[in-house]
Amino acid sequence: MKQYIFFLALIVLVSTFAEAGKKTEILDKVKKVFSKAKDKILAGVEDLNNMSELGCPFIDKWCEDHCESKKLVGKCENFDCSCVKLGGK
């Protein structure tokens, strides 16, 4: 219940500033905050992609070793290891 009252008060406060001619300043500040958040998220995604590129050789090697222990051939695609039997015997 307290959250609803807080958000109602926040809406009233924002609308009061908007009516007072400060609408563009508030909107600019909100846009800047969302822009910074977007940049941080995109940087995090880029870091995650870089880590996955570094991790692929380790996962490929693990997959090959895992399948070799089963006397199969290992193939790793998109972090999914699949063991394939060669030869039909």
From Swiss-Prot:
Compartment(s) where it occurs, according to its Swiss-Prot or TrEMBL record: Secreted
BetaSPN-type CS-alpha/beta domain boundaries: 53-89
InterPro entries: Long_scorpion_toxin_alpha/beta
GO cellular component, one term: extracellular region
UniProtKB keywords: Disulfide bond, Ion channel impairing toxin, Neurotoxin, Potassium channel impairing toxin, Secreted, Signal, Toxin
GO MF annotations, alphabetized: potassium channel regulator activity; toxin activity
Bilayer-crossing regions: none
Disulfide bonds: 56-76, 63-81, 67-83
Pro-peptide region(s): 21-39
Main location per the UniProt record: secreted
Domain of life per record: Eukaryota
Tissue: Expressed by the venom gland.
Signal peptide start-end: 1-20
General function of this protein: Inhibits voltage-gated potassium channel.
Family: Belongs to the long chain scorpion toxin family. Class 2 subfamily.
Protein name (Swiss-Prot/TrEMBL): Neurotoxin beta-KTx 12
Organism of origin: Lychas mucronatus
Taxon lineage: Eukaryota, Metazoa, Ecdysozoa, Arthropoda, Chelicerata
